[in-house]
């Protein structure tokens, strides 16, 4: 029997891009291709790129260059593949003319066509060797579940719609089947992702789908309830990311706080507020009522006291005054956001924000970002100290001689904090990766926790 052709794979960018990579790798394995862990062991290399900010563009271009140098046969996909250069030609083909093919994001079919053209598929693919959940690039105990593609918003700082298109929601039955297969495969935590999770179903007018004979609307609240019910059967977690602050988000909070889904639909919201001053939000083309947002955050916490709120912000947006920036700092203090990320505004090629007046010097943008993070760290440290002395449920991610590293319901992988768990004193309390354990919290800083089983 002849040796199977081998494909190397490089995956860059956000969790949405990671899911695209998983889908491509799943299809490659289904058709009998092997995945190579090295450039020199591969017959060709696929690079899945990111093109959102300048640093990501450069990282992607460097990765393509490295793959060309080390292997020579490279197919490029992802967001950067949809980006044009200043001359109007494809940016990747202009910088790296030797690439075999370039596609945009979410393009499994096009990538496979390119692979077939340059590396014909084997005659006997091993479809049965591919698990029902597909090939995953995350650890076995957690996985990303992408519920839609694209975005209908036109935020002035963002070019995602030009690369990934308008919102396209996946059929609810398809989403539920993937979730079930993931839980069956041993996944303990599903991270629901999209460009705009709250808008799920808008494009299909919230039409009714069916799962196991039950009607389920293509709508975030209904999907979350169905996922919560499924997760409860497996003792697993569901975590919500990229939740745009629509009024409909209010309906999800009770699912986190009470009833059969409590402890399965995690009390965690990743809400990209971006700013708090109405004038800045208006220039960003974002919802512009910070007072109402504060009221909603307070109401959410009344309903669900354990709620963790993560958000991202931009400091130094064009035209942002010192007074407007201070409004943002006040908002972070009053809202007591648990987890916060902040970017100093950086012009993105193709974004309409580039045409706005009032661009700030680099040093002002960076100084504001640093001040913002100081305030955010103070708020986070204060909230983290409240957890000392409590016993929390922790999902173990790593185990070593010095103990384990895990996460609570308040911590998403990669972006939030962790819990450092002491080694188990008794054999009966030993734990392994993917286990849920009860941990008494003994210490905290602004980001992480320490505890013992």
Swiss-Prot record:
This protein's UniProt keywords: 4Fe-4S, Cytoplasm, Iron, Iron-sulfur, Metal-binding, S-adenosyl-L-methionine, Transferase
InterPro entries given in the database record: Elp3/MiaA/NifB-like_rSAM (IPR006638), Methylthiotransferase (IPR005839), Methylthiotransferase_CS (IPR020612), Methylthiotransferase_N (IPR013848), Methylthiotransferase_N_sf (IPR038135), NA-bd_OB-fold (IPR012340), Ribosomal_uS12_MeSTrfase_RimO (IPR005840), rSAM (IPR007197)
Enzyme Commission no: 2.8.4.4
Domain Radical SAM core: 137-383
Cofactor annotation: [4Fe-4S] cluster
Gene Ontology BP terms: tRNA modification
Residues bound to [4Fe-4S] cluster 1: 14, 50, 79
Catalytic activity line of the entry: L-aspartate(89)-[ribosomal protein uS12]-hydrogen + (sulfur carrier)-SH + AH2 + 2 S-adenosyl-L-methionine = 3-methylsulfanyl-L-aspartate(89)-[ribosomal protein uS12]-hydrogen + (sulfur carrier)-H + 5'-deoxyadenosine + L-methionine + A + S-adenosyl-L-homocysteine + 2 H(+)
Compartments (UniProt record): Cytoplasm
Enzymatic class: transferase
Cofactor note: Binds 2 [4Fe-4S] clusters. One cluster is coordinated with 3 cysteines and an exchangeable S-adenosyl-L-methionine.
Family designation: Belongs to the methylthiotransferase family. RimO subfamily.
Annotated function: Catalyzes the methylthiolation of an aspartic acid residue of ribosomal protein uS12.
Name of the molecule in the record: Ribosomal protein uS12 methylthiotransferase RimO
Gene name, Swiss-Prot/TrEMBL: rimO
């Amino acid at each position: 029997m002849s040796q199977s052709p081998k494909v190397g794979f490089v995956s860059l960018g956000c969790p949405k891009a990671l899911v695209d990579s998983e889908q491509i790798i799943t299809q490659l394995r289904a058709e009998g291709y092997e995945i190579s862990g090295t450039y020199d062991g591969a017959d060709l290399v696929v690079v899945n790129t990111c093109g959102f900010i300048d640093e990501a563009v450069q990282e992607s271009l460097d990765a393509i260059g490295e793959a060309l140098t080390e292997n020579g046969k490279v197919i490029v996909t992802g967001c950067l593949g949809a980006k044009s250069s200043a001359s109007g030609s494809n940016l990747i083909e202009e910088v790296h003319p030797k690439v075999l093919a370039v596609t945009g994001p979410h393009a499994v079919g096009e990538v496979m066509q390119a692979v077939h053209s340059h590396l014909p598929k084997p005659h006997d693919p091993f479809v049965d060797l591919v698990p029902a959940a597909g090939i995953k690039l995350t650890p076995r105990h957690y996985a990303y579940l992408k519920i839609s593609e694209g975005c209908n918003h036109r935020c002035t700082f963002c070019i995602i719609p030009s690369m990934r298109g308008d919102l396209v929601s996946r059929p609810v039955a398809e989403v539920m089947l993937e979730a079930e297969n993931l839980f069956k495969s041993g996944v303990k935590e599903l991270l629901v992702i999209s460009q705009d999770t709250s808008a799920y179903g808008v494009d299909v007018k919230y039409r009714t789908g069916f799962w196991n004979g039950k009607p389920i609307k293509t709508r975030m609240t209904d999907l979350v309830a169905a996922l919560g019910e499924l997760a409860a059967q497996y003792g697993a977690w569901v975590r919500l990311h990229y939740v745009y602050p629509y009024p409909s988000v209010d309906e999800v909070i009770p699912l986190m706080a009470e009833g059969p889904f409590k402890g399965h639909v995690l009390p965690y919201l990743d809400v990209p507020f971006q700013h708090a001053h109405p004038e800045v939000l208006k220039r960003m083309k974002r919802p512009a009522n910070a007072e109402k947002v504060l009221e909603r955050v307070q109401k959410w916490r009344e309903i669900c006291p354990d709620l963790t709120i993560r958000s991202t912000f931009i400091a130094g947006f064009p035209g942002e005054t010192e007074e407007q920036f201070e409004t943002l700092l006040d908002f972070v203090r009053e809202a007591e956001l648990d987890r916060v990320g902040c970017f100093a505004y950086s012009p993105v090629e193709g974004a309409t924000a580039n045409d706005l007046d009032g661009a700030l010097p680099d040093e002002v943008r960076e100084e504001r970002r640093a001040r913002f993070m100081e305030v955010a760290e103070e708020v986070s440290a204060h909230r983290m100290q409240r957890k000392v002395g409590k016993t929390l449920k922790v999902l173990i991610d790593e185990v070593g001689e010095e103990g384990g590293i895990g996460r609570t319901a308040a911590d998403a992988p990669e972006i939030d904090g962790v819990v450092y768990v002491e080694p188990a004193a008794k054999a009966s309390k030993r734990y392994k990766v993917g286990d849920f354990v009860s941990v008494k919290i003994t210490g905290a800083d602004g980001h992480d926790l320490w505890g013992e089983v």
